[in-house]
Amino acid sequence: MTKFVFVTGGVVSSLGKGIASASLAAILESRGLKVTLIKLDPYINVDPGTMSPFQHGEVFVTDDGAETDLDLGHYERFIETRMNRANNFTTGKIYQSVLEKERRGDYLGKTVQVIPHVTNEIQEFIQRGAGMGTPVAVDVAIVEIGGTVGDIESLPFLEAVRQMSLRMGANNSTFVHLTYLPWIATAGELKTKPTQHTVQKLREIGIQADALLCRADRRIPGEERAKISLFTNVPEWGVISMWDVDIIYKVPRMLHEQGLDGLICDKLRLNTRPTNLQRWDDLVYATEHPQGAVTVAMVGKYVDLSDSYKSVNEALRHAGMRNHVRVQIDHVDSETIDSADAAARLARYDAILVPGGFGQRGVEGKIATARYAREHKLPYLGICLGMQVATIEYARHVAGLANANSTEFDPATPHPVIALITEWQDADGSIQQRDQDSNLGGTMRLGAQSSDVLAGTLAHRIYGDVVTERHRHRYEANVNYLEPLRKAGLVIAALTQREQLTEIVELPQSMHPWFIGVQFHPEFKSTPWNGHPLFNSFIAAAKARHQARHEGPA
């Protein structure tokens, strides 16, 4: 039978429930348990696909094409289990499902209410995410409830998991509550009162935490832990200190050394092998002992919030570990770059990356960036929109297609080298159609799709014959312009197996040492253990350029 760990949060948001949940999952996985994670988001959006990155951070895409919370990226980077659309759902998704059932008459004329209909639906979604009753059922499902205890939006989720825990029995579920202890500099002490109040709020709705993860900017002394235990009815060994660390991969060791996994296994009566976190220790050591450094300019439009590019940032760091260098990432606002000052802004970097994005703002700065990288032989990786701007730049300045553009930015362009594809086939074989007036939510090419890679290319050296990567985009390279671009020297290095859509473009090695644009999002499949072959190669090229410029090791 699947056991459940419910993770809640209090006092303030952004305490790191996702990292804490993923770290606990990693520890339990090291004990030989099959683990998954489920994220419950209290907002009314059906999914985060149409939300601004400035509000929500990046949208993480799964193999099956779900647009999900960025915490699922943490989950996949910390454990072996791959996420899918069942691992993340929102209030909007729940209400959508309930209303569809009501319209079908599934409730047999009853008055549809939050209790029991909405709370029952939440429980069904949780069980589905854990694979209960199926061959893919897991030993432990860690359920992270978004938001903060006390928020009205989270109440149906908290009530649902309270009911679920009661029904399952004491040894089949447990509650872990993440809280915050502020340091008051003028008083010179940590304050426990907010933690006391948030646990009290949790108890008011019928939930007693079995463990408290106490976030602070420093270790919590034993005296404060004893005080918290007394006022929250949590045993002192269940009051876990979670202080700020410089590397998130230190968190599993931190939690294990304070006995969190032992407490969970005892509560759930799980007999496991001993914990082995050696690979996490090795990972931290590799991170802390690089043999050099490279600096990468990430030129985008959402640079004011680094979480907008969370997976890209992590993929670059993973590749740094594989190449034994520390990767310094400078986020550069593309609106601040034009052709006249590109050299002044970009010359000092070892490599340039242009990530995905939507909308016209900052696009000309990205095009200028791609041109500078091409003309100055600076390693360039363009992801999604980054591939499209590289294609536009090449069309304008090499292929002689004046004013070439994407119809996303200029519907009247004389040379729409990037355009909206109106019909395509999903991973499940179903035909999808869209146009300029289609709904924005859920209408993109999404999820994992396979492409054939052209032999003899840089992409082939990196990937081999076939590449399978995740997608999230609405516009494509226009097939009508592929031949003129090829004749001008642009290499179309990979095409989708079904629709023959452009997936990878690159410059020939005779023209540029490392210049690749990809329509997909490779960052979603990078892990700290292996990195990702494309990012690994990109950082290797950055390292080689750094060594050539400085005539010594990076």
UniProtKB/Swiss-Prot annotation:
Similarity comment: family membership: Belongs to the CTP synthase family.
GO cellular component: cytosol
Other notes: CTPSs have evolved a hybrid strategy for distinguishing between UTP and CTP. The overlapping regions of the product feedback inhibitory and substrate sites recognize a common feature in both compounds, the triphosphate moiety. To differentiate isosteric substrate and product pyrimidine rings, an additional pocket far from the expected kinase/ligase catalytic site, specifically recognizes the cytosine and ribose portions of the product inhibitor.
EC number annotated for this UniProt entry: 6.3.4.2
Region annotation (Amidoligase domain) ranges: 1-270
Residues annotated to bind L-glutamine: 357, 385-388, 408, 474
Active-site residue list: 384, 521, 523
Residues at which ATP binds: 14-19, 71
Recorded metabolic or biological pathway in which this protein acts: Pyrimidine metabolism; CTP biosynthesis via de novo pathway; CTP from UDP: step 2/2
Domain called Glutamine amidotransferase type-1: residue spans: 295-548
Key words of the record: ATP-binding, Glutamine amidotransferase, Ligase, Magnesium, Metal-binding, Nucleotide-binding, Pyrimidine biosynthesis
Catalytically driven reaction(s): UTP + L-glutamine + ATP + H2O = CTP + L-glutamate + ADP + phosphate + 2 H(+); L-glutamine + H2O = L-glutamate + NH4(+); UTP + NH4(+) + ATP = CTP + ADP + phosphate + 2 H(+)
Free-text activity regulation comment from the record: Allosterically activated by GTP, when glutamine is the substrate; GTP has no effect on the reaction when ammonia is the substrate. The allosteric effector GTP functions by stabilizing the protein conformation that binds the tetrahedral intermediate(s) formed during glutamine hydrolysis. Inhibited by the product CTP, via allosteric rather than competitive inhibition.
Function field: Catalyzes the ATP-dependent amination of UTP to CTP with either L-glutamine or ammonia as the source of nitrogen. Regulates intracellular CTP levels through interactions with the four ribonucleotide triphosphates.
Protein name: CTP synthase
Organism: Verminephrobacter eiseniae (strain EF01-2)
Assembly description: Homotetramer.
Binding site for UTP: 13, 191-196, 227
Annotated residues for binding of Mg(2+): 71, 144
